[in-house]
Amino acid sequence: MTSNQKAILAGGCFWGLQDLIRNQPGVVSTRVGYSGGNIPNATYRNHGTHAEAVEIIFDPTVTDYRTLLEFFFQIHDPTTKDRQGNDRGTSYRSAIFYFDEQQKRIALDTIADVEASGLWPGKVVTEVSPAGDFWEAEPEHQDYLQRYPNGYTCHFVRPGWRLPRRTAESALRASLSPELGT
């Protein structure tokens, strides 16, 4: 029996991110919170340099980490530093917090594919960092858009958005010299 796996992603206000990710095949559960920062016991009013993030528990027999990341890059703009929509500041940065070297490798490879694809107009600024503490947000933030369907969000599914994978040759060139890989 394969056990569930965990991912932590940040990409703007956690309400919209959670709402779209929760419905993906293989996602078992989600919760919103704060990660990647410097304050213990982070709260909405005091989260220091933490990003608003979503912790995702997923069944790897139904979906994989790469598929989750491809969807993540579809529903938020990974090229705007410390900003999504009208939300500005480090709390709203794009970030992937990985749990092991395999997740790190997949994250970096997916970012390289996003950059090579030209689907976004600029350079990807998504932070890739080891997962640390995840401080669960207050109850009023959990499942927010499920309770308030017309609430604020700056995330949306882009119909027809598909991330192509780089060819083996371009991936090799990118790993040897990042500026040659595009």
Swiss-Prot record:
Catalysed conversion reaction: L-methionyl-[protein] + [thioredoxin]-disulfide + H2O = L-methionyl-(S)-S-oxide-[protein] + [thioredoxin]-dithiol; [thioredoxin]-disulfide + L-methionine + H2O = L-methionine (S)-S-oxide + [thioredoxin]-dithiol
Family membership: Belongs to the MsrA Met sulfoxide reductase family.
Function: Has an important function as a repair enzyme for proteins that have been inactivated by oxidation. Catalyzes the reversible oxidation-reduction of methionine sulfoxide in proteins to methionine.
Gene source species: Mycobacterium tuberculosis (strain ATCC 25618 / H37Rv)
Pfam family, one: PMSR
Encoding gene per record: msrA
Gene Ontology annotations for the cellular component aspect, listed alphabetically: cytoplasm; cytosol
Designated name of the protein: Peptide methionine sulfoxide reductase MsrA
GO molecular function: L-methionine-(S)-S-oxide reductase activity; L-methionine:thioredoxin-disulfide S-oxidoreductase activity; peptide-methionine (S)-S-oxide reductase activity
Catalytic residues (positions): C13
Keyword Oxidoreductase: yes
Sorted UniProt keywords: Oxidoreductase
